């Protein structure tokens, strides 16, 4: 693959420039074609298996077996086929819990029930785990020998909210004992423990979890072979759909030809699509994925313009032009910014045309407002850089909540969804609801932690790390630890917002939840969007390139 300097024209002398690596994938997804004939041959088999799985909800009566069935269905990525059945089963399970029918459950069963119910929005008390403590108020040492129970409690504990102190204790207790027992357990339990200790299930991107779990479940002697076969066929079917979407988005990006005109920006459109699959991978969210992917591409161009290439004077002009949103009012912009503005307007106009036929053109107003807010936040940071100002943590977060891009991307995804998104939902979304605010804080902090040292090697807006260090007089490592604690606290806030009753439909709430899950993957080891050459490359290959053997 050519280097960036041979692929792109020389930059204007005196301009800032970051040598981002070129696209990992190039035109791979334009040239690749899904094996449609193979998929068609299995279509009938998939429908047959789906109905067999559906019947299991009425034939499986044992509480633990039904919990294991629901857990496996969710982990294997096929739960969207059985939403009504799962909702009914968990509703009955909650009623049984209220009536004390779970008093005799062991640790593994009770923790699994707690996790499934909290995931469904039921506010089950964490006090149910008190019976596993000894007379001194600590978790009983006998539990250390129950690896399945420890893992079940560990996974459940990450659905805690503020005040669930016993779940904080459970995380500490189970982490210590799972690490110590890991060398002594065998597959597939070993792999489940390793994955959990890396990123707990509740915080893991669902589609990647499915890819991992299919391989793990295949090794489970107690697996349900019908469910396993169905999940494999479904994975391949959706992989084919995602490949077609990647082809369409790659062709769109190629036709835009922005890299030739704006060589300073990152080429990460496929990584942006990966992000959207982490939000919702199901077929009926296809349009939302496409809209959000395009808006990620535009946001990346804007970010690199404000952060790296543009002068402050130019950025002031661009921001004012975006605020006016008038195609005939851009003469004052330098040529390269005209390219940006026209591309942005063309993209939003195309989305509006698509929505107009369904009577949903009113949604575009909210997207435009979100883009304007993003531009203003980027400009505020550019002004800080220009003046050398280090803001307070409060000043920084007020702007960074918007520049983290999530408020705009949230709206972008919503406008592509079905009738569950109403004008009232969009009004709620545009006014920074608590859950979105928390997600944006977590996003900014998780971005700043791995990106900090790299970005500070050049002139860049002070990150939350620098702001915290200056304001509190702490060391770098102390500040990083504090930010990690803030991320953990943010997750508790998010968990609380997911409990019933929610202010908007669960499908909308889950967009924010899944956004936050993607962050755990993208920023686990580095800024995996900017440097997409390692883990992100592997993740994309596992979801969209490598097939699962039947």
Curated annotation (Swiss-Prot):
Optimum pH is 7.5. A motif (DDXXD motif) lies at residues 303-307. Mg(2+) 2 binds at residues 303, 307. GO terms for molecular function: magnesium ion binding; sesquiterpene synthase activity. Its EC number is 4.2.3.128. One of its GO terms (biological process) is diterpenoid biosynthetic process. Transmembrane segments: none annotated. Expressed in young developing leaves and in stamens. Not detected in tepals and carpels. Pfam families: Terpene_synth, Terpene_synth_C. Keywords: Lyase, Magnesium, Metal-binding. Signal peptide: none annotated. Belongs to the terpene synthase family. Tpsa subfamily. The Asp-Asp-Xaa-Xaa-Asp/Glu (DDXXD/E) motif is important for the catalytic activity, presumably through binding to Mg(2+). This is Beta-cubebene synthase. It comes from Magnolia grandiflora (Southern magnolia).
């Amino acid at each position: 693959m050519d280097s960036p300097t041979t692929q792109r024209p020389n930059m204007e002398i005196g301009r800032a420039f970051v040598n981002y690596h070129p696209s990992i994938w190039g035109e791979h997804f334009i040239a690749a074609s899904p094996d449609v004939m193979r998929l068609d041959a299995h279509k009938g088999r998939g429908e047959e298996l789906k109905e067999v799985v559906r019947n299991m909800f009425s034939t499986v009566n044992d509480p633990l077996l039904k919990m294991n069935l629901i857990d496996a269905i969710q982990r294997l990525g096929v739960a969207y086929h059985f939403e009504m059945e799962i909702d009914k089963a968990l509703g009955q399970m909650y009623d049984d819990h209220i009536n004390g029918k779970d008093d005799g459950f062991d640790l593994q069963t009770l923790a699994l029930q707690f996790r499934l119910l909290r995931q469904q929005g039921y506010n089950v008390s964490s006090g149910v785990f008190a019976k596993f403590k000894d007379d001194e108020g600590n978790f009983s040492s006998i539990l250390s020998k129950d690896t399945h129970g420890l893992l079940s409690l560990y996974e459940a504990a990450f659905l805690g909210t503020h005040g669930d102190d016993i779940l904080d204790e459970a995380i500490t207790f189970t982490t210590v004992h799972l690490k110590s027992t890991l060398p002594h357990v065998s597959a597939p339990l070993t792999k489940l423990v390793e994955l959990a200790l890396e990123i707990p299930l509740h915080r893991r991107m669902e589609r990647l979890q499915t890819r991992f779990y299919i391989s793990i479940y295949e090794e489970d002697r107690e697996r349900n072979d019908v469910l396993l076969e169905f999940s494999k066929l479904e994975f391949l079917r959706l992989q084919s759909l995602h490949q077609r979407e990647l082809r369409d988005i790659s062709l769109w990006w190629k036709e835009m030809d922005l890299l030739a005109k704006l060589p300073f920006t990152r080429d990460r459109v496929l990584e942006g699509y990966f992000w959207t699959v982490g939000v919702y991978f199901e077929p009926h969210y296809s349009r939302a994925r496409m809209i959000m992917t395009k808006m990620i591409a535009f946001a990346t161009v804007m970010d690199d313009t404000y952060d790296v290439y543009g002068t402050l004077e130019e950025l002031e002009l661009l921001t004012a032009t975006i605020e006016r949103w008038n195609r005939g009012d851009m003469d004052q912009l330098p040529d390269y910014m005209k390219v940006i503005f026209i591309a942005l307007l063309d993209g939003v106009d195309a989305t509006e045309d698509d929505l107009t036929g369904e009577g949903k053109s009113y949604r575009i107003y909210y997207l435009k407002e979100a883009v304007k807010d993003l531009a203003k936040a980027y400009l505020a940071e550019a002004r800080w850089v220009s003046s050398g100002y280090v803001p307070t943590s409060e000043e920084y977060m007020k702007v960074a909540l918007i520049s983290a891009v999530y408020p705009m991307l949230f709206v972008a995804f919503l406008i592509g969804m079905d009738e569950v998104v109403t004008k009232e939902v969009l009004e709620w979304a545009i006014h920074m609801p608590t859950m979105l605010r928390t997600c944006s804080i977590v996003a900014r902090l998780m971005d700043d932690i791995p990106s900090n040292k790299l970005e500070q090697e050049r002139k860049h807006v002070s990150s939350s790390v620098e702001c915290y260090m200056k304001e509190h007089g702490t060391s770098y490592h102390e500040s990083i630890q504090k930010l990690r604690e803030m991320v953990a606290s943010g997750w508790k806030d998010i968990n609380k917002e997911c409990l019933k009753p929610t202010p908007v439909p669960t499908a909308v709430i889950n967009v924010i939840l899944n956004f936050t899950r993607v962050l755990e993957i993208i920023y686990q080891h580095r800024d995996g969007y900017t440097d997409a050459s390692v883990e992100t490359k592997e993740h994309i290959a596992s979801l969209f390139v490598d097939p699962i053997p039947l």
